[in-house]
UniProtKB/Swiss-Prot annotation:
Name this protein carries in UniProt: Protein anachronism
Protein purpose: Negatively regulates proliferation of neuronal precursor cells, thereby controlling the timing of postembryonic neurogenesis.
Glycosylation sites recorded in the entry for this protein: N54, N62, N73, N116, N144, N342
Biased composition (Basic residues): 390-400, 437-474
Chain spans, region Disordered: 173-195, 359-474
Gene source species: Drosophila melanogaster (Fruit fly)
GO biological process terms held by the UniProt record: cell differentiation; negative regulation of neuroblast proliferation; nervous system development
Spans through the membrane: none
GO cellular component entries: extracellular region
Tissue/organ expression: Synthesized in some glial cells and secreted.
Subcellular location, record wording: Secreted
Keywords: Developmental protein, Differentiation, Glycoprotein, Neurogenesis, Secreted, Signal
Amino acid sequence: MASAMRGEKCERSRIRELVLILSLITMAGDSRATPFDPSFFIEGVQSEVVNPFNRTILNRFNLTEEQILSIQNRSNPNMRDDSAQSSNQQYLQQVATQRLNDIFKRVQKAISNEPNGSASKEKAGFPICNAETTNPEDWSLGNNVTLQFASSVFISNNDDRLSSALLRLYKTNPGQTREHNPGQASTQPISTENPGNTAPNCAEQPPVGPQIRVTVSIVHQQRKKQRKKRTCNTAMLSSSSTGWVEIDVKCALAYWEQQHRQQLRQQQPLQPQLTASVVGILMIEVHDDEENLLRPGLYFAPPTCDQADIAVPWSVYRTEPFKSHLASWTLPRKPRLDIFFNGSNSMKNSYNTPKSRAFIESTTSNSPTIDNQLDESGEYESQQRVHAPLVHHRRHHHNHQQPESESESAQLEAEIEAEELMSSASNSEQQMEPISNHHRHRTGHHHPHHQLHQHHHHHHRHTKHHRIPAHKQE
C-alpha cells in the first residue's frame, strides 16, 4: 500500500517536470530575443528589446509611432544622416525656388511696358557745320541764326519713345566785356539751382532790367528765299543775364520724326511724291520788350566746326567721378541739343507734354530767371477751334475703318498726335519777312498753301481707307 502511494507520487512529479520542460521549450521557441552582453546591464535596470511595430508593446509602454521613430533616429547613426540629408535637400529646394522667383520677376520687369521697368537713353549733339552756322559774320550780323542737327541725334532706335528735348544756349551779355575765350567756358559758373534760392538776402538782388524774348522756330525748307518756319517755343529772360538757357523743343522733334517717316514712305514704290521738307534745322530770333528785332549773335555764343556732331550727355557733367576732372577743364559754350528717350511706351504718353513751356537756367547770382508766361490764350483758343474739327473727324474716321496693319495704324496715330502737338505750339506757318510785320500779322489762321496741303493729305487718307472694304468684298 505504501509502495503504491510512493509510485503514484513519483509519476505525478515526473509529469509536472515534463509539463514544465515543455512549457519552457514552448516559451523559448516563441521568444525572438537575442543574447546580450552582461556588461551592458546596469544594476537595478532591465533592458528589453521590443518590436516597434508591435501594437501590444506600444500600448504596454504608452508610446506612439512618432516617439518610436524619434528614439530610433537618436539611436541609429545611419538614420540620423538620412534625416539630415533630407533636411538639406529641402533647404536647397527652397533656395532654388526663391532664386527662380527672383529671376522671373526681374525678367518680367525688364520686358514690361511700364515706365519704371523700361530702359532710358540720353543723346546729345552739337550743330552740323554749314555756311550759315560756321560763318562768324552771318552769326553776329544776321537778324536770325539757324542751327542744323544731324538726324542720328534725334531719330530714335528700337522703338524708343521721346521723353524730353532741350535746346541749350549759352547766354552772354553784349554790354559786358568778356574776359574768357568766347569758345570756352569754365565749369564753375554752371549751376542747376535757382540763384534766388541760394542767396541769403533777397534785398541784395538788383532790380530786373530790360527783357528779351527768344523765339525758336522749325524751318521747313532749305532755301532762304522760299524758307518757311513754324514757331516751336519762346522764352523771356533778362538782357544782362549770363549762363546756360534751356528751351523745350520737343515739338520740333515730333515734327522731324513725322517728316522722317513720310520720307521713308516716299522711297517705297506706288507712293505719292510730296514736297520734300528739311529736318533738323532750328531758327533763333531775339526781340526786345518793344518787339524790336535784335541780333541773336550778340546774345548767344556761336557754334564752331571744331566740335563733333555727337556731344557728351549733359547728365555726365553732374556725376561725382566727372566733377573732379572738371576742375582743370573747360566746358564748351556751344549750342547743343540734349534728348532723353524712354523704352517702348505708348504713343500717347510719348507726346503728351506741356505746351509752349521753357525752362530757363541762369548761372549768375545777379541775374534772376524769368519763366515763359506770355499771354497767348486768345490765339491758342482760336487755333484749337480751327484744328479741333479736323482732328475729331480724322479720329472718328480711323475708329470706324480697319487699318491695313498694326504698324500702319501706329504710324497714323503718331502723326495725329504730332499734329496736335504742333498745332498747340503754333500754327502760324508763313514766308520769311521782317519780324515787326511778323507779329503784326500773327493770327491763328493757316497759310493757304498749308491748308491746301492738309486737305489733300486728308483726302488721300480717305481714299486709301475706302479701298480696304472693296478689296475684302472681292
